[in-house]
Amino acid sequence: DYDGVLLTPAARQIALVSDDGDEVRLRVDAGVEWDDLVEWAVQRGLWGIENLSLIPGKAGAAPVQNIGAYGCEAKDAIRRVEMYCVETGTVLTLDAAHCGFGYRESVFKHDLKGRVIITAVEIALSHTPRPRLGYGDVEREVEARGGATLRNIREAICSIRRAKLPDPAVLGNAGSFFKNPVVEASVAENLLKAYPD
């Protein structure tokens, strides 16, 4: 049980900030479902977040955890984060360079935790194809679908994720959230010998 106030962002718009012919900047309200944003981008031929398909949660949560999957992280696309400062009642914008992004880390999990409410995220996507297929089974799954199109990459990622986790609509689960462990080389080698698959 949680003894406190829980705020859920209600704003769910995706707005064009700029398009220079290659880079497309979008302002995404915090309440947009992350996977809906990925599908929206794929439908419009915009590259950059397709490997983050099927990650549950809202766009406003993406910078907090610096969500990532299959060789891509939210920080790769995020340019700015808009937030409401609880202490001052003002709206602030933080450039990505000041978000303290690291492996599943950000300033929002530490210095700004409990002090701000993320209201929107500005991301940069591209019209230029930039497939990232070098992680695990992604390349094989994409090739089986006919090659590296945005749609094929999204479908491959979704297929891989569905094979690993039950559908939360059928069997409630917390999804996949973890940090890869950092161990000594000898420990990793022993694990690979014991579990080659």
Locations of the language-model features?
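Anion-binding (especially nucleotide phosphate/pyrophosphate-binding) glycine-rich loop
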Residues: 1-88
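Phosphate/pyrophosphate- and phosphate-bearing ligand-binding catalytic cores of soluble enzymes
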Residues: 91-197
